[in-house]
UniProtKB/Swiss-Prot annotation:
PTM sites of type N6-acetyllysine: K34
All copies of domain Cytochrome b5 heme-binding, residue ranges: 24-100
Designated name of the protein: Cytochrome b5 type B
Binding site for heme: H59, H83
Transmembrane segments: 123-140
Propeptide: 1-15
Chief localization: mitochondrion
Organism expressing this protein natively: Homo sapiens
Function: Cytochrome b5 is a membrane-bound hemoprotein functioning as an electron carrier for several membrane-bound oxygenases.
Family per similarity comment: Belongs to the cytochrome b5 family.
Length: 150
């Protein structure tokens, strides 16, 4: 390992039974922290490092949003915004490596939405109050119209 960057070779399958050699570049958090300007901007999302410098002017939320998260772990902010599947797919083109395993903090719970079941009941937070309000409205109309007819 030289400096704050390391490369590891790994082999895997391409899904067609062929062995494929893949190379992962590891970055230390100190290295990522240096990349926090308009000239070079790196983000860490779920242990993966992304060079989003080319995306600064295109980001729908503006470059300020990216600059606030530059050089640090932006996983929580990324998930809080609720990025679309298209945005997650687009992120792949900016991938440059992973955070070095010794710099990863152990996660108590996964923030990956594909593994997170809490949002499956998110609709209940909105639909139940709406149904309740509609029912109250009907009851109010029923009782006020009944009192007028008697």
């Amino acid at each position: 390992m030289s400096g704050s960057m390391a490369t590891a070779e790994a082999s895997g399958s391409d899904g067609k039974g062929q062995e494929v050699e893949t190379s992962v570049t590891y970055y230390r958090l100190e290295e990522v922290a240096k990349r926090n300007s308009l000239k070079e901007l790196w983000l860490v999302i779920h242990g993966r490092v992304y060079d989003v410098t080319r995306f600064l002017n295109e980001h729908p939320g503006g470059e300020e949003v990216l600059l606030e998260q530059a050089g640090v772990d932006a996983s929580e902010s990324f998930e809080d915004v609720g990025h679309s599947s298209d945005a997650r797919e687009m992120l792949k083109q900016y991938y440059i490596g992973d955070i070095h395993p010794s710099d990863l903090k152990p996660e108590s719970g996964s923030k990956d939405p594909s593994k997170n079941d809490t949002c499956k009941s998110c609709w209940a937070y909105w639909i139940l109050p709406i149904i309740g309000a509609v029912l109250l409205g009907f009851l109010y109309r029923y009782y006020t119209s009944e009192s007028k007819s008697s």
